[in-house]
Curated annotation (Swiss-Prot):
Record GO terms (molecular function): hydrolase activity
Family as reported in the entry's similarity comment: Belongs to the UPF0173 family.
HAMAP family linked: UPF0173
Lineage: Bacteria, Bacillati, Bacillota, Bacilli, Bacillales
Superkingdom classification of source: Bacteria
PANTHER family: UPF0173 METAL-DEPENDENT HYDROLASE MJ1163, UPF0173 METAL-DEPENDENT HYDROLASE MJ1163-RELATED
Record carries keyword Secreted: no
Keyword Secreted: no
UniProt entry keywords in alphabetical sequence: Hydrolase
Name of protein: UPF0173 metal-dependent hydrolase MCCL_1373
């Protein structure tokens, strides 16, 4: 199957005839190849609620009727915006949907949005483990390095791992490479969350040079096959 990258942390895939998008940051994302007014999906899965991840969720969900999967707080926030089709999950939950299973796992980050000068708490930030038939995708979300990445990988060995490398807000190159080499050990590593803003500009090739497993550097609209 093919998993497509769309800049920052946004990925899409299709399984069992259902289309899934993760963290649909499209408008305002200079690297995105998608159009929020035409993208068609059945599910929107969110790691957390920062603007570069929540992105265009509200507009896409209202237009398409896609089910939004996120933390309870994030689902409640979206319900208040008129998004009716949501499924709340939390860390440790592992639910079978018609496209496959989603498990919410830890990520070490923050999770809020600011509206009219008010900070709104949106629950714990998360990583995601997708089990699609015999294939496993680990999307780390936004996170620093933490040792239980090894436990997540032992429970769910990943065919592909989407790992943030941009530093400043998440792991940088050195920590991300350590996570891949020593903790997660996926078959393929795909760097994400870099070069979208000045704060997170890094040399992606330096990450590839430090990683022992196969690295797939994707431009927006390109895919990795598992």
């Amino acid at each position: 199957m093919e998993i497509f990258f769309h800049g920052q942390s946004c990925i899409t895939f299709e399984h069992n005839g259902k289309k899934v998008i993760v963290d649909p940051f499209i408008n305002g994302n200079k690297l995105s190849d998608l159009d929020s007014e035409t993208v068609e999906v059945d599910y929107i899965v969110l790691t957390h609620g920062h603007g570069d991840h929540l992105g265009d969720t509200e507009a896409i969900a209202k237009r398409t009727g896609a089910k939004v999967i996120g933390t309870p707080e994030l689902c409640d926030y979206l319900a208040g915006k008129g998004v009716e089709n949501t499924h709340p999950m939390n860390i440790g939950g592992n639910v079978a949907f018609d496209f496959g299973k989603v498990k919410y796992v830890q990520a070490f980050h923050s999770n809020s949005i600011t509206e009219a000068g008010e900070i709104i708490y949106l629950g714990m930030p998360c990583g995601l483990v997708f089990t699609l038939g015999e294939k496993v995708i680990y999307h780390c979300g936004d996170t620093g390095l933490f040792s239980d990445m090894k436990l997540i990988a032992e429970r769910h060995p990943a065919d592909v791992c989407f790992v943030p490398i941009g530093d400043n807000f998440t792991m940088g190159i050195d920590d991300a490479a350590y996570a891949v080499n020593e903790l997660i050990k996926p078959t393929i590593a795909v760097p994400i969350h870099y070069n979208t803003f000045p704060y997170i500009e890094v040399d992606v090739n330096a990450f590839a040079d430090k990683v022992h497993t196969k690295v797939k550097i994707l431009q927006s609209g390109q895919s990795v096959s598992i």
